[in-house]
Curated annotation (Swiss-Prot):
Keywords: ATP synthesis, Cell inner membrane, Cell membrane, CF(1), Hydrogen ion transport, Ion transport, Membrane, Transport. The keyword Transferase does not apply. It comes from Acinetobacter baumannii (strain AB0057). This is ATP synthase subunit delta. F-type ATPases have 2 components, F(1) - the catalytic core - and F(0) - the membrane proton channel. F(1) has five subunits: alpha(3), beta(3), gamma(1), delta(1), epsilon(1). F(0) has three main subunits: a(1), b(2) and c(10-14). The alpha and beta chains form an alternating ring which encloses part of the gamma chain. F(1) is attached to F(0) by a central stalk formed by the gamma and epsilon chains, while a peripheral stalk is formed by the delta and b chains. Its main location: membrane. InterPro entries: ATP_synth_OSCP/delta_N_sf (IPR026015), ATPase_OSCP/d_CS (IPR020781), ATPase_OSCP/dsu (IPR000711). The keyword S-adenosyl-L-methionine does not apply. HAMAP family: ATP_synth_delta_bact (MF_01416). One of its GO terms (molecular function) is proton-transporting ATP synthase activity, rotational mechanism. It is a peripheral membrane protein.
Amino acid sequence: MAELLTLARPYAKAAFAYASEQGATDNWSNALQVLSAAVQDEAFSAYLNRPELTPAEQVKSFAKVLGEDQSQAVSNFLTLLADNDRLVLLPEIAAEYEQLKSQNNNNVDVVIESAFPLTAEQEQLLKSALEKRFNSTVTVSVEVKPELIAGVVIRAGDQVIDDSALNKLEKMRTRLLA
């Protein structure tokens, strides 16, 4: 996963830089989401991975998926990905692009994993604290993960704040076995 993200990051940065320059970040965002979904579709992915398909034919397949939404710039981007055998990275490129877009809009997407469902008040308190910490607007999504036992794990981009009982038990175990 980390390797795919490492490969996808330069493509996402280039796409975002171009889209920002052209004032078309939302159009690119929509196109990348559609392309990402197409690549994740098993039937379409199997069709794309046929050895007899040339990169140009792969790009034509995406043109059918996007229809009128495909600009020349998106077509050129797809050609670059196809020529370098990187079409499989589209989901990671789309995710990284969205993260860059959020950063540019001074917005941070945060995932809070909790052992138990959070009340609206708890969620609001966490959101306020995170907005102060990141000095940005925060968009929160909450996931319930009982395996954490207690506490929360907060993920914002590549930052992780792990205050779960599971993590504390693992640290204790490591110290005792050392």
